[in-house]
């Protein structure tokens, strides 16, 4: 039984030319390329722009100007403004870190401090108060009648799960025990990774962080500008309650529809299996490099694997249709 991530509601060419725009986005020029409502519980939020009432910029203002030029800037403007007003020193510090990154060769990243930040962020996850949005401590029994399926086969449970969520605006999957065990074991040693989401103007990077059987995602720009206050924009919930008896793990998701639609969330969710469940050492090697040798990590390797897998093809087609 293969695990296929579904959403209710061919290999692609490798990258030919890249222009580094900012730490969270790479615009790529190449030949033509081929999840659920969020409950605000563990929702964190994000990033700013020049405007009246804001603290003065640096000497040349280049850091702020570059940030405003970010294609995704408008999406995070209010949160960035909030950070700039409430803690100007922290805001300037984050701009300086971005400037340091820009001095590195395109495709390379100095991630040591970033990994440390993500580890601290994970420790803080369980301490955050429940708020509107994501569901805290979500269990299988909260979304599914476990008693009803005790006498069902794995295939019957799979059909029930798929039928139930196919009518909902969400991402869901039924993962075979062997595949989940592989993902889970690898997540214990490599709990953090980076996914690339195709956008009209390039790719936006999302950071994934395991906390228990939940996998939280947030845009890289959020972490750069908000640090520990960065909010989860997508959470994948894995339910292992039936793993030993039925040989399957059920998965569903919640997302912040302000930032992600279902097709985008599905693209991110599929990359979990692409990088964590692969039998190709070079692909999982990217995850290991990100966690253990961050200074050697290349952002563009993630994009290259995503393109070769074809996982972003549907999203690209939808974006191209929107253009017309």
UniProtKB/Swiss-Prot annotation:
GO function terms (MF aspect): protein-containing complex stabilizing activity
UniProt GO cellular component terms: mitochondrial inner membrane; mitochondrion
Subcellular location: Mitochondrion inner membrane
SS bond partners: none
Distribution of this protein across tissues and organs: Widely expressed but with low level.
Membrane-topology descriptor: Peripheral membrane protein
Protein name, per record: ATP synthase mitochondrial F1 complex assembly factor 1
Organism the protein comes from: Mus musculus (Mouse)
């Amino acid at each position: 039984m293969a695990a296929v991530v579904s959403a209710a509601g061919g290999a692609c060419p490798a990258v030919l030319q890249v222009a580094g725009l900012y730490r969270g986005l790479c615009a790529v020029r190449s030949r033509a390329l081929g999840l659920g409502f969020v409950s605000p519980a563990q929702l964190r939020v994000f990033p700013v722009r020049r405007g009246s009432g804001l603290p003065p910029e640096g000497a040349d203002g280049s850091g702020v100007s570059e940030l405003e030029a970010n294609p995704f800037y408008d999406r995070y403007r209010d949160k960035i403004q909030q950070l700039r007003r409430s803690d100007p020193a922290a805001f300037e510090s984050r701009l300086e870190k971005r400037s340091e990154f820009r001095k590195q060769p395109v495709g390379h990243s100095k991630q040591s401090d970033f990994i440390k930040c993500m580890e601290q962020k994970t420790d803080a996850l369980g301490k955050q108060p429940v708020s509107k949005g994501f569901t805290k401590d979500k269990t299988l029994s909260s979304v599914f009648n476990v008693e009803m399926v005790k006498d069902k086969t794995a295939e019957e449970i799979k059909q029930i799960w798929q039928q139930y969520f196919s009518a909902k605006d969400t991402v869901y999957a039924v993962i075979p025990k062997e595949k989940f065990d592989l993902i889970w074991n690898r997540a214990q040693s490599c709990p953090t990774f980076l996914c690339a989401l195709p956008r009209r103007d390039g790719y936006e990077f999302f950071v994934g962080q395991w906390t228990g059987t939940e996998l939280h995602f947030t845009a890289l720009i959020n972490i750069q500008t908000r640090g520990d206050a960065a909010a989860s924009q997508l959470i994948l919930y894995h339910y292992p309650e039936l793993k030993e008896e039925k040989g399957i793990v059920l998965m569903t998701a919640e997302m912040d529809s302000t930032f992600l639609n279902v097709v985008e969330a599905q693209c991110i969710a599929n990359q979990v299996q692409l990088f964590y469940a692969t039998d190709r050492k070079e692909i999982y090697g990217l995850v290991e490099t990100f966690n253990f040798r961050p200074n050697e990590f290349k952002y563009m390797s993630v994009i290259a694997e995503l393109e070769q897998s074809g996982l972003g093809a549907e999203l690209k087609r939808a974006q191209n249709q929107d253009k017309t």
